[in-house]
UniProtKB/Swiss-Prot annotation:
It catalyses: 3-oxoadipate + succinyl-CoA = 3-oxoadipyl-CoA + succinate. Signal peptide: none annotated. It is an enzyme of class 2 (transferase). GO terms for biological process: beta-ketoadipate pathway. Pathway: Aromatic compound metabolism; beta-ketoadipate pathway; acetyl-CoA and succinyl-CoA from 3-oxoadipate: step 1/2. Its EC number is 2.8.3.6. The gene is catI. This is 3-oxoadipate CoA-transferase subunit A. Keywords: Aromatic hydrocarbons catabolism, Transferase. GO terms for molecular function: 3-oxoadipate CoA-transferase activity. Pfam families: CoA_trans.
Length: 282
């Protein structure tokens, strides 16, 4: 059953050094505030999983929190590369980073398999692809019924999944709407799940066929308004395109990046204080 906690309390209790951690959210509802809190608390040796690593994982990798990344695409959307990710892979700064690259369909199916309690996922994929040549976790099996060759990949079972959502009720049930990626599957695949939300209400008034994550599947719900900035939260605020553009020169240089996180993340007590500090600089 989900507890209503501060984000600081949730990260302290449920994210441990060495954990496999998935921060999911596609296009919007990206759990930025949670990534900041993981950095503030100095979590390390993490195996990060995310279908589309963007700024949140550039931050975590550059801050020295990660030892491995499982992913299916990485970049600063609409801008360019993730320079802290590249620096870690190419030059081992601040830590050497092991990478485990998959296709989108592969990783989505891996989450589904994890949520289903299965050891691996099976899919039609990788015909003509070079990924199986460089990723030993992509294997091939023959269907026992038709003989067809299929790809097989390990399921993803995070120690903890973190997502951002629009609403939760006071019992800890969570409502998401708009574009959904694999938040539901990642939450159900995990041993523990933290959800940050824009607001906590008495009644979700959930529309038919909406995505509701029940309290029994979650560990903690944290009230963090604006917690997915600079991504958008459908129905609450728009994407901050200027922030994504401004991130590129910050992340390109090690000293500039380190000074930025020291001032804006390690130098603030929580995401609310971070937001106020960012607003001052605009």
């Amino acid at each position: 059953m989900a507890e209503l906690l501060t984000l600081r309390e949730a990260v302290e209790r449920f994210v441990n050094d060495g954990d496999t951690v998935a921060l999911e959210g596609f296009t919007h509802l990206i759990p930025t505030a949670a990534s900041h809190e993981i950095i503030r608390q100095g979590k390390k040796d993490l195996h990060l999983v995310r279908m589309t690593p963007d700024l949140v994982y550039d931050l975590l990798i550059g801050a020295g929190c990660a030892r491995k990344l499982t992913f299916s695409w990485g970049g600063n959307p609409g801008v360019g590369s993730l320079h802290r990710l590249r620096d870690a892979v190419e030059k081992g700064w601040p830590n050497a980073l092991e990478i485990d690259e998959h296709s989108h369909a592969d990783l989505a199916n891996s989450y589904v398999a994890g949520a289903s309690g299965l050891p691996f996922a099976v899919l039609r994929a990788y015909a003509g692809s070079d990924l199986p040549k460089v990723n030993p976790n992509i294997k091939f099996i023959n269907c026992p019924f038709t003989g067809e060759q299929l790809a097989a990949v390990p399921s993803v079972r995070p120690d903890v999944t973190v997502i951002h959502a629009q609403k939760a009720d006071r019992k800890g049930n969570v409502l998401l709407w708009g574009i959904l990626g694999v938040q539901k599957e990642a939450a159900l695949a995990a041993k523990r799940c933290i959800v940050t939300v824009e607001e906590i209400v008495d009644d979700l008034n959930a529309p038919m066929n909406s995505c509701v994550l029940p309290t029994w599947a979650l560990s903690a719900v944290c009230h963090v308004p604006g917690g997915s900035h600079p991504s958008y939260a459908h129905g609450y605020y728009e994407r901050d395109n200027r922030f994504y553009q401004a991130w590129d020169p910050i992340a390109r240089d090690r000293e500039t990046f380190t000074a930025w996180i020291d001032e804006y993340i390690r130098g603030t007590k929580d995401f609310s204080e971070f937001q106020a500090k960012i607003a001052e600089g605009k």
